[in-house]
Structure formats: C-alpha cells, structure tokens
Swiss-Prot record:
Protein name per the record: DNA replication and repair protein RecF
Function: The RecF protein is involved in DNA metabolism; it is required for DNA replication and normal SOS inducibility. RecF binds preferentially to single-stranded, linear DNA. It also seems to bind ATP.
One Gene Ontology term, aspect cellular component: cytoplasm
GO molecular function terms noted in the UniProt entry: ATP binding; single-stranded DNA binding
Residues noted as binding ATP in the record, renumbered to the chain: G30, D31, N32, A33, Q34, G35, K36, T37
Nucleus is among the record's keywords: no
SUPFAM superfamilies reported in the protein's UniProt record: P-loop containing nucleoside triphosphate hydrolases (SSF52540)
Length: 369
C-alpha cells in the first residue's frame, strides 16, 4: 500500500496544505521547527489515530481554530481507499470512503505504518508502558480483533479497580464475576502478544545479524505477568493467579496481574540490552523497525508505509548505509524528514523531494547528486 496524497486543514502549523507523493521515496527537507515532523505526524495519525508526540488532540489544532482535519488517498492491493479524521472540541470522527467508523478496530489497519523516530531509542531502557504501547500499535494494525479484545479488557479492568477502591469488605463472588470477564479478554490479549513477539524476534534477529555482520544475536522475551509455559495454559493460569491475589488486590486497591503489567526484554548475545552500548541500542532499534516492516508484509500480504522522522542524524555512517539499503530492499513507500541532503547520496536519483517552510510544503525538482 502507499499513500497517494495528503490534505491538512488547521493541523498544527498548517492552515491548509496538500501534497501528492510517489510510491517510492519521499523526502521532506527544511530547517527545524518549520513543520516537517508535523507533516509526518499527520500521516501517522491518519493511520493509528494517535500522535507519537502528544496525548492531547487539542495540541494538533491550529492556533485559534476549533477543529482540524486530516484526509488522504490510499492505494491498496484491494483498491483505492479514502481516509479522513476530523478533530474538534466535541471529539473525533474517523471515516473510510466517507463512511463513519463506529469503533477504532473498524478503522485502524486500513493504512499500516511503521514509525522510526528519535524517541524510539528509549524503547529498551524506558518504562514498560512504552513497550506495551509498541506492541499495541503494531498488533492493532495487523489484527483488528486485537484492539477489540484490548478495549474490552481495559474496560473490565477499570470496573474491577473501581470496585476494589470503593468497598470496605470484599465480595469474592462479585469479584469472581469480574475475574471471568477479565480473564476472557486478557488471555486473548496475551495470546496475541506472545505470537507477535515470537514472530517479531525471528525477523529482528535476521536484520540485526545483517547489521552486525553476524557478530551479534538479538532475542526478545515476552515477559507476561501471568506465569505460563504454553499458550493453551494462559486462560487457566491467569484465572488461578487472579484468585490467589484477591486479598492483595483488595489491600492495594488495584489489579496486580494481567496484560496491563506485561513487558518486553531485549537481549544481545544473551546479555540484557539494558547494559548494551549506545551504538548497540541504535542497531537494536533499527533491526526492530525493519522487522516490523517485514512482519507486517508477511502477516497481511500488503506493504506498510515507513516513516523515518529525523533519525538519520541519530545514526552513524554504517547504520545509515544499512538502513537505506534495507529501505531499498523492502521496496515500501518511505518518508524521510531531514535538515540536509548530506546523508542521502545513496538514494535513488528520482526521489520526490519536498521543501517545508513555515507551515507550507511544496514539491522541489532538485535531484540528488
């Protein structure tokens, strides 16, 4: 799949902007704080209905305006698709081919993206919440049913925690009713995550071995808060552990076990990557991002769109070469933001170049030397 055009109205620092893209490589060039990342963020938002930079939709609306819109034309193997998101103080509306979508799980997945931004370098050492979000975003695009299961799980979890906080004496029978619902959806979420991480780990290791010239092995471990050895055991083990922690949950007023406590651990040559060098971290994340692209292609049969937000400056020459080589090999539509063409000499000469300046974007005819 590839996005053919994007239209913005009152988005960030863009009052009105439109751009038509090529199915290959598209480069946004401009000084800092001109709107390059905003444009890339809009593509990301159109796909996953969230920003990688802010939690508030209000931050996305142009100064003194009450609403904004992002729309785009997508070319998929199954045909052309029109996507649109409207944001206002009343909430948001998502549309596919002009039809409103009632649920996120009906919308997300229509356009798949993989984002590589500087903040991704915090994935290994950052909070577990970052790693859960990483799984949620990828799985939500690959398997719409995952978002439905996760949404139901979070709803029941909220109910269970609210009950624990509101009572002075525990009603184990009532809590068991909530447990049944929590385990039903939570075991599905964990099963999805387990299968995803197992597949992702294989792809990531392939890319990491290529980047390290065969000197390093990358592995990823899914650390579920529920102890189990096989996927078939998840439901029963989750139920057993919930029952044994009723008193603990009552005293602490929250639910101590479940996918909301899950984590990922990365290893390089069987050593926890928390202790890896900065260069190894960069290679790990680069491997992970290219693995996301490969896995989405394998599992859906269609290409995701790759978004590279100001990451060339974060990589040394060797890793830049590896990244650009992988981009060519994967043959996916790619967007790059940069302040300079210095690192792009290895790219095809027929790239689409866009100059971004003070909230305007225009096609440039400059070719790479």
């Amino acid at each position: 799949m590839w996005i053919k055009e994007l239209n913005l109205t009152h988005y960030r620092n863009y009052q009105q902007a439109s751009a038509a893209f090529s199915p290959g490589l598209n480069v946004f060039i401009g000084d800092n704080a001109q709107g390059k990342t905003n444009f890339l963020e809009a593509i990301y938002f159109l796909s996953v209905t969230r920003s990688h930079r802010t939690k508030s939709d209000k931050d996305l609306i142009y100064f003194d305006e009450r609403d904004c819109s992002i729309s785009g034309t997508l070319e998929r193997l199954s045909g052309r698709v029109q996507l649109e998101i409207l944001l206002s103080d009343k909430g948001r509306i998502t549309k596919i081919n002009t039809l409103k979508q009632a649920k996120l799980s009906d919308y997300i997945g229509a356009m798949m993206v993989v984002l590589f931004a500087p903040e991704d370098l915090q994935l290994v050492k950052g909070s577990p919440n970052l790693r859960r979000k990483f799984m949620d975003i990828d799985l939500g695009q690959i398997k719409p049913v995952y978002l439905s299961d996760l949404s139901h799980y979070n709803h029941v979890l909220k109910q269970r925690n609210a009950y624990l906080k509101s009572v002075h004496q525990l009603d184990n029978d009532f809590l068991s009713v909530l447990d049944e619902q929590l385990v039903t959806y939570g075991s599905r979420v964990m099963a999805h995550r387990l299968a995803f991480v197992q597949s992702l780990a294989k792809e990531a290791n392939k890319h990491h071995q290529a980047i390290s010239n065969g000197l390093e092995k990358l592995s990823i471990s899914y650390q579920a808060s529920v102890s189990f050895e096989h996927q078939q055991e998840i439901y029963q083990q989750f139920m057993n552990q919930l029952k044994t922690t009723h008193q603990r949950d009552f005293l602490r007023k929250n639910t101590g076990v479940g996918p909301h406590r899950d984590d990922l651990v990365f290893y390089i040559n069987d050593m926890n990557a928390n202790f890896a060098s900065q260069g190894q971290h960069r290679s790990l994340i680069l491997s992970l991002k290219m693995a996301e692209v490969s896995l989405m292609k394998q599992l859906t049969g269609d290409n995701p769109i790759l978004l590279l937000d100001d990451v060339m400056s974060e990589l040394d020459n060797t890793r830049q070469t590896k990244l650009l080589g992988a981009v060519k090999k994967e043959n996916v539509q790619t967007f790059i933001t940069t302040t300079s063409l210095e690192h792009l000499s290895q790219l095809p000469k027929d790239i689409s170049l866009f100059k971004v300046n003070k909230g305007t974007i225009e096609r440039d005819s400059i070719m790479i030397d």
